[in-house]
Amino acid sequence: MLVGACGLYSLHPFPRYRALSYSRSTLPEVIIPGPEGRLEGRFAPAPRPRAPVAMILHPHPNAGGTMNNRIVQELYKTFQRRGFATLRFNFRGVGKSQGTFDNGIGELSDAASALDWVQSFHPEASTTWIAGVSFGAWIGMQLLMRRPEIRGFISVAPPANMYDFTFLAPCPSSGIIIQGEGDEVVTPGAVQKLVDKLRTQKHITIHHDTIPHANHFFEHEMDQLMRSVDNYLDMRLDPNSPIR
């Protein structure tokens, strides 16, 4: 059953992410003006003014999710390698970011402010992408509905059994949803229902990859996860791609 944001954490507590996070990045820290004060981030500028923009959103703050989450860092690196102006940041109350957890409402505002910030450095960006992991995938999909410049998304383990995704009516952009077959937190069946619903909509194409044996953290299947991401980006970023 889908539930609203306020009831998520008490009904469906996430496992802790902290043990699966990398150590602090050596990239320069950036401070972004957010709705409740500063937001801590890491930013990789692009080599050219019209380069595309990408932003990656981390898992649930109350479960130890941060911008140093392993999957977040891998997504960050793959966009950076492709020449994107790439940002990852901590939601309010995480790390050096000011504020307190706001059940998704404030976090969506954080994401909007962060995207404004990165776009200010690349106002002529050719395209914008959003990627999110678990809770971050839910926030990212909401941001997608509010920002028409977002042309693609990567959603890893979107918590379709915990949060209401009916706001995607219609979903304005094509993207990929990636799920672990052995995910003990986000049930594959709930994600499949979300995919099936999105695929009934016109003018978008939804890819869906299921990674065999992978749990919610993809701790033993990171290579397979990133291969799925890279294959999708190869296809979407090809000038001859049928998906725009």
Which residue stretches match the model-derived regions?
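Catalytic histidine neighborhood in serine/cysteine hydrolases
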Residues: 198-217
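N-terminal cap/lid segment of alpha/beta-hydrolase-fold proteins
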Residues: 11-49
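Alpha/beta-hydrolase active-site loop
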Residues: 101-121
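Short, surface-exposed "cap/lid" segments of acyl-processing enzymes
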Residues: 47-84, 88
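Gly/Ala-rich beta-loop-alpha elbow adjacent to hydrolase catalytic centers
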Residues: 132-140
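Conserved alpha/beta-hydrolase "acid-adjacent" motif
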Residues: 184-190
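Alpha/beta-hydrolase fold nucleophile elbow
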Residues: 122-133
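Short beta-strand/loop motif that positions the catalytic acidic residue
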Residues: 171, 177-179, 183
